[in-house]
Amino acid sequence: MSDLVLVLNCGSSSIKFALFDAGVQPPPRKPLWNGKVDGITGPAPTFGETGVTPGPVALDTAHPYNAALQYIRTRVLARMEQGGHHITAVAHRVVHGGAKYSDPVRVDAAVLADLRSYIPLAPLHQPFALEAIAALLESNPDLPQVACFDTAFHHTLPDVEKMLPLSWDAWERGLRRYGFHGLSYEFMSVALPERYGDAARGRTIVAHLGSGASLCAMQGLESVATTMGFSALDGLMMGTRCGSLDPGAVLYLMEIEKLSLEEVGQLLYHQSGLLGLSGVSSDPRALLPLEAENAQVEAALALYV
């Protein structure tokens, strides 16, 4: 029987999971088994796993996220029984740990309540990871769960890089630049020296490029500057997010065009970036073949790069 660690990465429309052997040192980078449920909130969700082509999966349309979690749980438990394995702990990617959490932390009810207070700072991601944690706390209260934070890697930022040019009172109230994608950058801080030796310990710029995107400047393998700030809206233009934007434009949308707070949030998070400008897709792979024949697509890609 092997002791395994289950790793969950819960997003707004997908849940990725992986199983790692807990008894191997150093910890393995390649999972024994992994997969994901994708398109959870869409009309045609799919499930895929190691060695299996993704196929359709039926989820309760009233509670699709809980249904997806339960589906993964059932598949993982079945896999465990087949191999005689045992899950000893669950690790979660949690986007926001605020100024408080600079290291992974074991989650209990008090920590969970604390992490819920950061939902307004990461509304696209935080609720879904916490939903999974809460579900497992209820069904398996004795199973250790550990939260690993995307913000933690950026705790090494100098104060001047954390500050927003607002009032000192705002700084003391916690309005500051946190930085994101830290788990990705932390991985690179380990992988780069293995490939490039001491050169990687100098001044390095690392890019995290996906639907969400950011850059991180590292020195001595620590974060010293990053493009994302107070929220995951900041920095580079992204798939559906605007990136850096003159705040006067937001005031104009609300004061002159009379958009509500909810409408502005929907625009900035879900209807901007590549999707907003192209009117076609948030995925560069879908846009590149259309660049020569569609002026909007051409403009979107030009601004993106």
Task: State where each predicted segment sits.
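Conserved active-site "lid/cap" helical segment
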Residues: 41-85, 132-134
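Short glycine-rich, Thr/Ser-proximal phosphate-binding strand/loop in the N-terminal lobe
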Residues: 5-7, 14-62, 229
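Beta-strand segments within the central parallel beta-sheet cores of soluble alpha/beta enzyme folds
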Residues: 203-207, 262-271
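Short beta-strand-loop/turn "lid" adjacent to the catalytic site in phosphate-handling enzymes
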Residues: 76-125, 144-146, 153-163
